[in-house]
Amino acid sequence: MYKKIPTYKKGEWSYTEFETQEEFARYLTTLFKEPGQYGFDEVALLFNEEANRFNKNGFYCDKPFRSKDYIKYWNDQKEKCREGVIYYGEKNTWYITRDYYMWLNFLPIFDKEEKKYGFAKVRDAQYHMALYEALAEIHHKHAAILKKRQIASSYFHM
């Protein structure tokens, strides 16, 4: 098996398996659209659920340190940061790449709009950029990006 990706569908977690790199590349290609056409819905609120939990509580996991539940939580998060996550909505499906998931949930950045440190917001342009780079990587290509200023891409490409 080439990849096993955590998958969220209708409130349940499971896995989507890809037998080959080519199968995964074909799957990513089906998800790739023009910016503005990704159709984020309420499921997109889950993309940065861990960052929102941290903002609300001041910590990520409320389980006792080194307990089985604590270790399971962090193992699940490490897996999502290594493999990415697939989310199914009512009409659309999204693959959050491993680096985009980590960036949204675990890398506070300076928000120039709010003038304070916080987590990145889910933005169509950054999702598109992450998917574009994943497609380039899987096809062993380089990626050139023409983008507007002030969308935190310097943080994303560290």
Question: Predicted segments — roles?
Answer:
Residues 1-158:
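Phosphate/NTP-binding elements of NTP-utilizing enzymes
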